[in-house]
A protein has these predicted regions:
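Polytopic transmembrane helical bundles with strong interfacial aromatic enrichment
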Residues: 1-122
């Protein structure tokens, strides 16, 4: 069964906006400048993933681009891993999470490349 990439992208977008607002209003007085910068990076990249995932789903559903599921899975996993680990580091999470963050980034890149490949083949 193909996941509803549009729904998942919209959900990630909502979480991204909420995370950004929480960072600006709830964490600004509690985090140092570097940690706040990390939090903002996590929220921003979550939005990038949300928009890409929504676009992947929309174009896939319209039949403009076929075979988008691989891209969707990579974009979803990459967004969650990258943004999740960066946000955890901003909040003082264990430093070993820094070694996991590039896995999320690599999955995001793979998702964009798989989407490009699917678009090229369609």
């Amino acid at each position: 069964m193909t996941p509803n990439w549009i729904f998942l992208g919209a959900l990630l977008g909502a979480v991204s906006v909420g995370a950004g607002a929480f960072g600006a209003h709830g964490l600004a007085a509690r985090l140092d400048a570097r940690s706040l910068e990390l939090w903002e990076t996590a929220a921003r990249y979550l939005m990038y993933g949300a928009l890409a995932l929504s676009m992947t789903g929309l174009l896939g559903r319209m039949g403009v681009v076929r075979g988008v599921d691989g891209a969707g899975w990579c974009l979803l996993a990459g967004s969650l891993i990258f943004s999740g680990t960066v946000a955890a580091l901003a909040l003082g999470g264990p430093r070993w999470l820094g070694a996991v963050t590039p896995i999320g980034g690599t999955l995001l890149i793979a998702g964009f490349l798989l989407f490009a490949w699917a678009a090229l083949k369609s």
